[in-house]
C-alpha cells in the first residue's frame, strides 16, 4: 500500500496542479468520517475490514502500559490531523496505537486567514499557520458522547488543549481550565499546548510564571487523575526546558511531549514559497517534518537525562521511517507521534514503522519496546 501511495497518489497530490493542502486534508477526513458513521453498511464494513488488513500490524512486543493505559503499539496520530474528532473511530483501523485529537480551545474559532497550510516537498516538511481552527471544546465533548467510542476494544485518545485567541494571556489558566472541565471525562490523557507559534503570545506561556498558573489549576479539577502532559517547542534553550521540567515535577504532571513545530528556517532547501511567491523566511507559521528530526530527538534525550528516565516522554517531529522512530525511542520517548510523515507517505507508514521496530528489537536482543526506551542513554 505504501508503494501504491508513493507511485500513484503522491505524484497526483504533489503535482503542479495539486489541490490546496487544507482542502485535500478535509477530503480525507470527510471520507474517513463517512466510513466511521456508516457502520451499518455492508460495503462500509467491508472497507473497514480491508483497511485493517492493509494497515494494522500487531505484536505483543510492541505493547506498553503507561499511566495505567494500554497502548497496543507506540505509534500515535499527532494533534492537528483530526482537530474535532471528525474521524474519531477510524484511527485504530489505520494501525495507530493511540490518537491525539485537537488542538481544541474553549471558544470555537476559525483560525488564521487562508491559505495557511503549505507543503515543502524539497524539505519533506509542512508549513502551517492554522491558528487553532476548531469547533470548540463543547463540540468535541459532544462528539465523544455521540460516538461513544464505537470500537469494541480499548483505544487511548489524547485531547490537546490550547488557549482561545480571544482570551487575554493573563486569563489563560481559566481558559485551559474551562476546556478541561468540558472534556475531562472524554479523553484518556490531556495535553497543555503552550508551544504553537500560530497564536499570538502563546509561547510566552512556556515561561515558568505563566505555566505554573495553568498547572496549578488543572489538577484540582482532575478528580479521575487523568494523565496531564505539557507540550514544548523545539526552539527552547536547554535551560528553559530544565525549568519546565522542574515545574512538571513540582505539580506532579504526568509527562512531556517533545516537540511542537519550529519557527527556525535556517536549514530549509525551500527559499521561496511557491504558493505565495514570498521568501520562506518572511512566511509566518511553524515547520514540521524532516527539518525537525534531529532537534526533537536531541530534546528528548536531554529530558530523559535530566529526569533520569523517570518522566514519560511522547516524541514527535520528523518521523518518516522505523529508524527515525527507533532513534526517538532509544533517546527516551516511550511513545511517538506522526503527522507530516503520514502526509508524505500515506497510511502504510504506521505498519512500516512497526515492522521495522520489531526488527530493531530482534537485532538488539530485546523482548519488548519498553526495553528500548532510553537505550541510547544507558
From Swiss-Prot:
Residues given in the record as substrate binding sites: 83, 128-132, 193, 198, 260-261
Mode of membrane association: Peripheral membrane protein
Q: Name one GO cellular component term.
A: plasma membrane
Gene Ontology terms for molecular function = dihydroorotate dehydrogenase (quinone) activity
| Enzyme active site | 196
Which cofactors does this protein require? Answer: FMN
Named in its record, the pathway it takes part in is:
Pyrimidine metabolism; UMP biosynthesis via de novo pathway; orotate from (S)-dihydroorotate (quinone route): step 1/1
A GO BP term, please?
A: 'de novo' pyrimidine nucleobase biosynthetic process
Q: What is this protein called?
A: Dihydroorotate dehydrogenase (quinone)
Amino acid at each position: 500500500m505504501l508503494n501504491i501511495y508513493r507511485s500513484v497518489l503522491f505524484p497526483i497530490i504533489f503535482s503542479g496542479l495539486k489541490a490546496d493542502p487544507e482542502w485535500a486534508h478535509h477530503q480525507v477526513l470527510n471520507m474517513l468520517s463517512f466510513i466511521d458513521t456508516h457502520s451499518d453498511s455492508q460495503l462500509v464494513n467491508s472497507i473497514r475490514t480491508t483497511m485493517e488488513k492493509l494497515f494494522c500490524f500487531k505484536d505483543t512486543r510492541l505493547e506498553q502500559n503507561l499511566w495505567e493505559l494500554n497502548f497496543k503499539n507506540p505509534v500515535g496520530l499527532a494533534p492537528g490531523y483530526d482537530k474535532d474528532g471528525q474521524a474519531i473511530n477510524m484511527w485504530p483501523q489505520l494501525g495507530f496505537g493511540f490518537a491525539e485529537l485537537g488542538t481544541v480551545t474553549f471558544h470555537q474559532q476559525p483560525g488564521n486567514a487562508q491559505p495557511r497550510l503549505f507543503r515543502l516537498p524539497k524539505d519533506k516538511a509542512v508549513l502551517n499557520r492554522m491558528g487553532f481552527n476548531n469547533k470548540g471544546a463543547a463540540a468535541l465533548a459532544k462528539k465523544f458522547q455521540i460516538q461513544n467510542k464505537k470500537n469494541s476494544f480499548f483505544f487511548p485518545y489524547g485531547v490537546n488543549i490550547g488557549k482561545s485567541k480571544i482570551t487575554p494571556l493573563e486569563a489563560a489558566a481559566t481558559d485551559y481550565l474551562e476546556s478541561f472541565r468540558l472534556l475531562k471525562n472524554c479523553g484518556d490523557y490531556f495535553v497543555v499546548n503552550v508551544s504553537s507559534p500560530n497564536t499570538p503570545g502563546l509561547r510566552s506561556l512556556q515561561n515558568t510564571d505563566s505555566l505554573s498558573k495553568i498547572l496549578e489549576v488543572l489538577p484540582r479539577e482532575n478528580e479521575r487523575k487523568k494523565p496531564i502532559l505539557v507540550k514544548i517547542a523545539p526552539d527552547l534553550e536547554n535551560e528553559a526546558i530544565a525549568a519546565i521540567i522542574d515545574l512538571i515535577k513540582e505539580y506532579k504532571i504526568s509527562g512531556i511531549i517533545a516537540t511542537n513545530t519550529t519557527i527556525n528556517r535556517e536549514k530549509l532547501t525551500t527559499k521561496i514559497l511557491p504558493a505565495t511567491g514570498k521568501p520562506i523566511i518572511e512566511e509566518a507559521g511553524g515547520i514540521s517534518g524532516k527539518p525537525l528530526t534531529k532537534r526533537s530527538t536531541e530534546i528528548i534525550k536531554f529530558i530523559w537525562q535530566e529526569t533520569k528516565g523517570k518522566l514519560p516522554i511522547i516524541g514527535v517531529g520528523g518521523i518518516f521511517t522505523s529508524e527515525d522512530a527507533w532513534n526517538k525511542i532509544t533517546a527516551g520517548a516511550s511513545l511517538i507521534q506522526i503527522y507530516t510523515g503520514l502526509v508524505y507517505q500515506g497510511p502504510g507508514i504506521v505498519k512500516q514503522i512497526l515492522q521495522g521496530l520489531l526488527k530493531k528489537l530482534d537485532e538488539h536482543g530485546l523482548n519488548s519496546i519498553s526495553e528500548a526506551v532510553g537505550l541510547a542513554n544507558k
